[in-house]
Amino acid sequence: VQQCIQLVADPGVPTVQKTYALRVMVNPMLVMEASTERVMTPELVQALAVQVWRQVQHGAGVYGDDELRVELLQMSTLVLEHSADLLASESTTKMDAIKFGWSFLPLEDVTVKHAAYLLISRFLQRFESPLKITGQVYVGLLRLPPNDGRGLVRRALDILVPALPERVPSTDSTSPPLWVKWTKRTLLD
């Protein structure tokens, strides 16, 4: 995994090779991590944050290929799914993870955008986040038009919706929770 992270960070390596390494080696290992021994360590998570997640924040155009973006987002989602406890102690690393996903939301490619929503939904499920961010992501998911990537949107909603009662607490016991109001308003629009 460490070598693949270094491979992805290396600008001299062709994009196809990076994508293939993630698709064939790293992501399957992370999928199996739930049923086998832990693959990710605190050092690997830190390397991922420094060499992959922070590169997007610096405006580096290293991830120009949509297939590579999807594989990186999938890898990041799997890390959050199976190794969120390794990020919990490092607030900077947590911020790097959500900023990484957030940076792909404005892109045109539907699959990349939906994979980014999936990553952010997993993040919001696992960690406390400002109410404004949770609301933006939830409403953004509800407003996405039906198209080819709808399966990813459903997965993101399946992850986020059960966490909403905890992440968006009700202010008043007599009125419906805020996230119910968001849903109603979005459906009426």
Segments the model singles out, each with a brief description of its role:
Residues 7-19, 35-43, 55-70, 88, ...:
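Short coil/turn segments at helix-helix junctions and helix-capping linkers
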Residues 2-4, 94-101:
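Short linear interaction motifs
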